[in-house]
Amino acid sequence: EWAYDAQAESLIKRIERVADYNERQPQGSRIRGVMVDIEPYLLEEWKEKETQRPGLMQSYLTCIQQGYRYAAQRDLEFWVCIPIFYDTSCPDILEALVRDGCDGIAVMNYNRTDEYAQMAKEVELARAYGKGVICIYELQQPGKHDLEEINTYANQGLEALWQSAEGLEKQFQYDGLRFAYHYYQPLRQML
């Protein structure tokens, strides 16, 4: 729903809760930032490429930018979780998002076929604009949330995932690149 809210009123209220919490905490106990995972590609308007998608994505971008500005005012980092396909489906939105809408992006790199190419543009933009980028690996079992075997490391194991991360670090050579797992429960089961 936040994708519809170009004024970012609801998003800003959530950020405000975190910022208000921080004001009551000693410096060392404060929350450093927030990550937003707004998924406009799950909405009906996304399917209407020519007619409705551009307006939806502009509203999404404006919401993100408003949230970023507010988070910065409240001394919070602001990261945005994105899929691997914005570079091909809406490249101008992706660039504006990285340039003007976040401190960093977290790319849901949930397809093992070509993990480098799937996030090459995102890393290129992050590097160009001095932003961070996180490569998120999926760990849930195939069959959950329409995941297929190729989307997850659940059956390949953590060693294969770590080899992938090492390879991406070497290929990208970008100090702003980090890695994360989706999510804690399946990670615990794999350890």
Q: Where are the model-predicted features located?
A:
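Aromatic-lined carbohydrate-recognition surfaces of secreted/lumenal glycan-active proteins
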Residues: E1-A6, M57-P91, K131-P142, Y181-H182
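Aromatic-lined carbohydrate-binding surfaces of glycoside hydrolases
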Residues: E1-R17, G33, D37-W46, F85-D87, ...
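An active-site-proximal structural segment forming one wall of the substrate-binding cleft
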Residues: Q7-M35, C63-Q66, L94-V98, A160-Q173
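Alpha-helical scaffolding within the catalytic cores
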Residues: R14-E23, I84-L97, D114-L125
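Active-site groove signature of glycoside hydrolases
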Residues: V18-M57, G176-Y181
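Structural preference for beta-strand elements that scaffold enzyme active sites
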Residues: G28-M35, D75-C81, D103-A106, G130-I136, ...
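Aromatic- and acid-rich polysaccharide-binding/catalytic face
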Residues: I31-R32, I38-L42, C90-A120
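Substrate-binding cleft of secreted/luminal carbohydrate-active enzymes
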Residues: M108-Q118, V123-L191
